[in-house]
């Protein structure tokens, strides 16, 4: 049953917000004065964790009650029509990284804090009483007071208007949703510039960071705003776009209009020592959030079931914009290794959500943020649309969309209607089959009676219920074929004639931009494999990708995949190496640690990587290509897994040389040097040294490298010490806990310790990060590691009674299937796969 929307009772038009924060008392108080139109005499207004002292309607005090089963109050307004509702309240500062909360950091060993906000999805109600629903757009005037110290900076969605009696007044916002309101204050460092159209661009951090760490993202943000204004043909509507890095932040970033907030790792980097991959990551996060300033902020989904409208489009636009800003990066290749891979794996599990999901109960909202579906799959859908339309038609349709819906709300069909005006294709009809249905098809391509035929059927990894789903599939063939496959079966005609006309092996989904995989019969596959080494990198990646997925779904055997790896071991493309080692890594599940199969698999890794390591060496070279720079990490990691003695020796020698200056070690190789040192030369002293550096450094990339190494310890005593840090926020921040937990759990020597910890500390974990939309991914992490019947049974014993939690329900059920499939796959394939690996070593 649908839960009543508060917007049905009251339409806010403008908020006058007064908020007084007392950091010393860990609390705040204020008045939320809401101008709007009362729709029903009993008005519902959201609040959470608040003490409400008084409510007035048009200056007259009225009765109110707290909801028993919802986060809000019922106000007996006694009237309908235009009114002003004023609510006096107080509330605590939280330590959940939601609502208004402190972030903690150190400068020269001195502990400091910065106050910031996070209101998406439903946390504005923790900061001020409001109608906390996306459709309830209004303007906001913020007056902010706090226990201010000299030298502190205050930021909000809009520029500051004036300061009177210690109160900071900010200019009125444009119409926007409550979840986009933001403010922050504390000691900050900043850099600013202006776009060609005059928009103020700023990057802000704590003073733990140097000015040079802000330069890269400032440049990206400036050029991104300029690009979007041109591409959307719609001006950026605010006078400022400020980017703020918060030391504690639950998500990756948040698109608050005019004041975008980020996890430090996704905004700040040292331009003198960072990887190209990290530059790409920061650039795509910044451009993703700035794409939201139009898609999400200017035009907002009516309700959370259209979350994809915000996230999927921003996810596509981050790549489109970075490709324009830095064409030499070939950023669409990163789309193939991250978005495509994530979506195709997740979307093959029965029970997965569709991109567009009906959601009625607000308690279900945070469960919608499935990164592999709403972000990755959704963006693949929009890449399909872009491919069908072309950029000019896309821009024309988007301008129409923004012109019609700016400062308002929209649903998916509004976008399809706008885009369809720019083409003769029925975009909505095509896209509904992808957005409203979970899963995706495998297209079987085969020669029968001399004809090339295609069939489509939903693809599953593990058990799946076939319900006859059908998709409108853009075939993207490299031969004469229909643009769209609408039917379950398709006869394309005489195979030999098609082959002769094409002059090359016949393939589907060229470019890997449509959301399906292909299973070729032996005739077609043999033809493709003859040309495999001459295919472009994306096609080679796709070949490995589809073989891996088919093997996971038991429509092919991993034993047959093993010989294919050899074909690509000397590829100089980093995305092919990504696909190669992603596929090879899947073979690890069949080789128990310390077994003969494990020994053979490591030897195979050494064979696959040794020529590349010899070609590239450990140390980056002046003038080497971006491809070589990005390929080196894959082959070094593979070489170390393969226990190549020369690689282990070189890595140790590099560590010794940089032992007293590890921060200066090239970021391109630093994680592998550190991991090698911990795995092969580990000690309590080394662990203590690395965790000391972890706590002392403010460089997010260096922190990640140190964490990746520390969790690789093979010593049970050291691992127990590491696990003991999980609840110590002075060492492991809650925002980073999942990464630490995942690292120890993925370590065979630490798996039991981490599994015991999460079961023992579940109540604490839920209290600490349970309100985070990414809380469910702790379960995802577990499903990626477990592979035995015993672990499957333990998983069920622990998680079954937690299915009543709406945030966790789908994840628990899906990951149960993921583990069950892995257990079944290992049982049926292990002997054949390990035999194939052994055979590959004899060649």
Swiss-Prot record:
Coiled coil: none annotated. It catalyses: Release of an N-terminal amino acid, Xaa-|-Yaa- from a peptide, amide or arylamide. Xaa is preferably Ala, but may be most amino acids including Pro (slow action). When a terminal hydrophobic residue is followed by a prolyl residue, the two may be released as an intact Xaa-Pro dipeptide. The active site is at 289 (proton acceptor). Its cofactor is Zn(2+). Its EC number is 3.4.11.2. Pfam families: ERAP1_C, Peptidase_M1, Peptidase_M1_N. It is found in: Cytoplasm. Its main location: cytoplasm. The record marks 375 as: Transition state stabilizer. Substrate binds at residues 120, 252-256. InterPro entries: Aminopeptidase_N-like_N (IPR045357), Aminopeptidase_N-like_N_sf (IPR042097), ERAP1-like_C_dom (IPR024571), M1_APN-typ (IPR034016), Peptidase_M1 (IPR001930), Peptidase_M1_aminopeptidases (IPR050344), Peptidase_M1_dom (IPR014782), Peptidase_M4/M1_CTD_sf (IPR027268). Optimum temperature is 54-55 degrees Celsius. Binds 1 zinc ion per subunit. GO terms for molecular function: alanyl aminopeptidase activity; metalloaminopeptidase activity; peptide binding; zinc ion binding. Aminopeptidase with broad substrate specificity to several peptides. This is Aminopeptidase N. It comes from Lactobacillus delbrueckii subsp. lactis.
């Amino acid at each position: 049953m649908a839960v009543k929307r508060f917007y049905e009772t009251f339409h806010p038009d403008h908020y006058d917000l007064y908020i007084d924060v007392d950091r010393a008392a860990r609390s705040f108080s204020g008045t939320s004065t809401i101008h709007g139109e009362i729709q029903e005499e009993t008005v519902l207004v959201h609040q959470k964790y608040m003490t409400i002292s008084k409510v007035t309607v048009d200056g007259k005090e009225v009765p109110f009650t707290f909801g028993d089963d919802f986060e809000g109050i019922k106000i007996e307004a006694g009237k309908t029509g235009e009114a002003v509702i004023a609510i006096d309240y107080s509330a605590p500062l939280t330590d959940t990284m939601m609502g208004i909360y402190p972030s903690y950091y150190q400068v020269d060993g001195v502990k400091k804090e910065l106050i910031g906000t996070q209101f998406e999805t439903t946390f504005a109600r923790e900061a001020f009483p409001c109608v906390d629903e996306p459709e309830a757009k209004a303007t906001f005037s913020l007056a902010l007071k706090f226990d201010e110290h000299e030298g502190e900076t205050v930021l909000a969605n809009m520029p500051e208007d004036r300061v009177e009696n210690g109160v900071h007044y900010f200019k009125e916002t444009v119409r926007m949703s409550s979840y986009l309101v933001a403010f922050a204050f504390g000691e900050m460092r900043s850099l600013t510039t202006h776009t060609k159209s005059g928009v103020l661009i700023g990057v802000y951090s704590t003073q733990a960071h140097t000015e040079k760490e802000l330069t890269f993202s400032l440049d990206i943000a400036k050029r991104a705003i300029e690009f979007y204004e041109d591409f959307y043909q719609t001006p950026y509507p605010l006078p400022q776009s400020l980017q703020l890095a918060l030391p504690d932040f639950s998500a990756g970033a948040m698109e608050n209009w005019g004041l975008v907030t980020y996890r430090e790792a996704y905004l700040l980097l040292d331009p003198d020592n960072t990887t190209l991959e990290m530059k790409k990551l920061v650039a795509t996060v910044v451009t993703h959030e700035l794409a939201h300033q139009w898609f999400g902020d200017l035009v907002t989904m009516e309700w959370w079931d259209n979350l994809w409208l915000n996230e999927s489009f921003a996810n596509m636009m981050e790549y489109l914009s970075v490709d324009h800003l830095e064409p030499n990066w070939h950023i669409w290749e990163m789309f193939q290794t991250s978005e495509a891979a994530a979506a195709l794996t997740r979307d093959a599990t029965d029970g997965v959500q569709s991109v567009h999901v009906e959601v009625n109960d607000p308690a279900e909202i945070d469960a919608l943020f499935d990164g592999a579906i709403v972000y990755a799959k959704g963006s693949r859908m929009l890449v399909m649309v872009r491919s069908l339309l072309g950029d000019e038609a896309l821009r024309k349709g988007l301008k129409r969309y923004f012109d019609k819906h700016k400062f308002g709300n929209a649903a998916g069909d509004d976008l399809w209607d706008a885009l369809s005006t720019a083409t003769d294709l029925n975009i909505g009809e095509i896209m509904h089959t992808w957005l409203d249905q979970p899963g995706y098809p495998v297209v079987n391509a085969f020669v029968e009676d001399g004809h090339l035929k295609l069939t489509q059927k939903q693809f599953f990894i593990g058990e799946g219920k076939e319900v006859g789903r059908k998709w409108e599939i853009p075939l993207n063939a490299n031969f004469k074929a229909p643009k769209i496959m609408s039917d379950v079966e398709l006869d394309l005609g005489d195979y030999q004639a098609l082959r002769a006309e094409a002059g090359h092996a016949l393939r589907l989904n060229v470019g890997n931009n449509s959301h399906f995989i292909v299973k070729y019969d032996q005739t077609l596959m043999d033809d493709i494999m003859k040309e495999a080494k001459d295919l472009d990198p994306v096609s080679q990646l796709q070949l490995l990708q589809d073989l891996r997925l088919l093997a996971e779904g038991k429509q092919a055997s991993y034993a047959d995949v093993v010989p294919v790896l050899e074909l690509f071991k000397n590829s100089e493309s980093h995305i092919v190496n990504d696909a190669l080692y992603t596929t090879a890594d899947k073979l690890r599940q069949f080789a128990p640690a310390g077994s003969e199969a494990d020994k053979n698999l490591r030897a195979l890794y050494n064979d696959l990587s040794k020529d590349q390591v010899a070609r590239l060496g450990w140390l980056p070279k002046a003038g080497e290509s971006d491809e070589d720079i990005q390929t080196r990490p894959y082959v070094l990691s593979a070489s170390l897994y393969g226990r190549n003695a020369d690689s282990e020796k070189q890595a140790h020698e590099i560590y010794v040389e940089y032992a007293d200056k590890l921060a200066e070690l090239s970021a391109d190789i630093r994680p592998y040097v550190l991991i090698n040192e911990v795995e092969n030369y580990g000690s309590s002293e080394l662990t203590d040294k690395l965790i000391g550096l972890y706590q002392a450094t403010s460089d997010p990339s260096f922190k990640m490298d140190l964490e990746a190494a520390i969790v690789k310890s093979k010593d049970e005593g050291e691992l127990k010490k590491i696990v003991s840090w999980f609840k110590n926020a002075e060492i492991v921040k809650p925002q980073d806990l999942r990464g630490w937990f995942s690292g120890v759990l993925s370590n065979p020597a630490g798996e039991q310790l981490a599994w015991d910890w999460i079961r023992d500390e579940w109540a604490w974990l839920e209290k600490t990060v349970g309100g985070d939309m990414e809380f469910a991914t702790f379960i995802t992490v577990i499903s990626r590691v477990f592979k035995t019947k015993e672990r499957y049974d333990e998983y069920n014993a622990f998680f079954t009674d937690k299915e009543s939690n709406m945030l966790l329900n789908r994840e628990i059920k899906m990951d149960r299937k993921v583990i069950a499939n892995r257990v079944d796959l290992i049982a049926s394939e292990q002997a054949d796969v390990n035999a194939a690996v052994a055979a590959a070593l004899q060649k």
